[in-house]
Amino acid sequence: MIRRATIVAVGRLRGWAAEGCEDYLRRLRRYFPVEVIEVAEADMNRLGRGEALREEAGRLLRRLPADAHVVALDRKTGRRYGSEELARRRLEPLAVSGRGHVAFVIGGPLGLAPEVLERADERWSFGEITLPHALARVVLLEQLYRAVKILRGERYHW
């Protein structure tokens, strides 16, 4: 299993999304440290789409841990995995390879700039549907928690 996770995301969560993330963070932190770094959303109205995306990219890239294996969440170019495959073929091998620190990068409403995608060691997708960035963060944490349970041979549902 991974030894440490960092989530670097555009935007601050509120309401139900913040509550959902806090629930899964509490569960995950029993197994390994998880840090969440939120960067400010760029003002698209003031900057325009392209410049706003570049500004967010700079903020994200500056906050990515240098020692981490970086996973970008991207609907268009990311690879899709089932829960078992995600646990056994992606997360478990990272720990064995010595790259136990994984940083997940999640864009805001504009997505991720090409330079962020290029920096990533790999890209994941949760499918063809477009998820709001807040929901993508909840889904990521839920899948990480599910992977922990799979790898430890523990029950997920009671």
Swiss-Prot record:
<comment type="function">
    <text>Specifically methylates the pseudouridine at position 1915 (m3Psi1915) in 23S rRNA.</text>
</comment>
<dbReference type="InterPro" id="IPR029026">
    <property type="entry name" value="tRNA_m1G_MTases_N"/>
</dbReference>
<dbReference type="InterPro" id="IPR003742">
    <property type="entry name" value="RlmH-like"/>
</dbReference>
<feature type="binding site">
    <location>
        <begin position="126"/>
        <end position="131"/>
    </location>
    <ligand>
        <name>S-adenosyl-L-methionine</name>
    </ligand>
</feature>
<dbReference type="GO" id="GO:0070038">
    <property type="term" value="F:rRNA (pseudouridine-N3-)-methyltransferase activity"/>
</dbReference>
<keyword id="KW-0963">Cytoplasm</keyword>
<comment type="subunit">
    <text>Homodimer.</text>
</comment>
<feature type="binding site">
    <location>
        <position position="73"/>
    </location>
    <ligand>
        <name>S-adenosyl-L-methionine</name>
    </ligand>
</feature>
<keyword id="KW-0808">Transferase</keyword>
<dbReference type="GO" id="GO:0005737">
    <property type="term" value="C:cytoplasm"/>
</dbReference>
<dbReference type="Pfam" id="PF02590">
    <property type="entry name" value="SPOUT_MTase"/>
</dbReference>
<keyword id="KW-0698">rRNA processing</keyword>
<keyword id="KW-0949">S-adenosyl-L-methionine</keyword>
<dbReference type="InterPro" id="IPR029028">
    <property type="entry name" value="Alpha/beta_knot_MTases"/>
</dbReference>
<protein>
    <recommendedName>
        <fullName>Ribosomal RNA large subunit methyltransferase H</fullName>
        <ecNumber>2.1.1.177</ecNumber>
    </recommendedName>
</protein>
<comment type="similarity">
    <text>Belongs to the RNA methyltransferase RlmH family.</text>
</comment>
<keyword id="KW-0489">Methyltransferase</keyword>
<feature type="binding site">
    <location>
        <position position="107"/>
    </location>
    <ligand>
        <name>S-adenosyl-L-methionine</name>
    </ligand>
</feature>
